Amino acid sequence: MPDSTTVLTPERLYASPSLSGPAPRGVKFSPDGKRVTFLKGRPDDQDRLDLWQFDVQTGIQSLLINSQLLQPHDAELSEAEKALRERKRIAGAKGIVDYSWGTADTILVPLGGDLYLVSLGEGEPQVRQLTDTDAFETDAKVSPKGRYASFVREGALYAIDLENGNETRLSPAAEPDKAISYGVAEFVAQEEMHRFTGYWWSPDDHYVAYTRVDESTVDIIPRF
């Protein structure tokens, strides 16, 4: 009988995929409570995540959004996005790594630095691209009432009216020369407190509270 044992090196113990097997990520209920959605790796590529659903009534699991439907090819990540994924411990993940429910039949998906609004219904999901910029849109959310999609771009907070598509900057513009940004979670919040957002909607969609981050007194230490 051939020897099927494998030597487990330290590199393999901490590499992807996990030896304990795949686990669902980003588990959420839909607003109407009829579905449980989660991110799941593909059988042929566990690092590439698609959005799946569990129908509460029937108990059936099915693929909801194929990541390649939104973006067939992987985009080059920005340095800020790479750092954020490291802090979230998803540095090796591809495809859909985050999403936000809007209404019971709409989902906001950030992918490749842009935002997509996916409408669910009979047949294939309908995709509407909300942004198409060279900059990365991060920390995307749908407002509590479902009227706006909000996000951070280049250190400033923005919102898109989903009815007419108008985009508005909600905060002052960032001042990179002074190391000042708005609506972002600074390094300590992300790394030590596991807080990855820097802004919060009021329940009625009328107000947004956001952080002003001043890192001008933080020393720059080269990372080797």
Please provide the spans of the model-predicted regions.
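Beta-propeller folds
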Residues: M1-F224
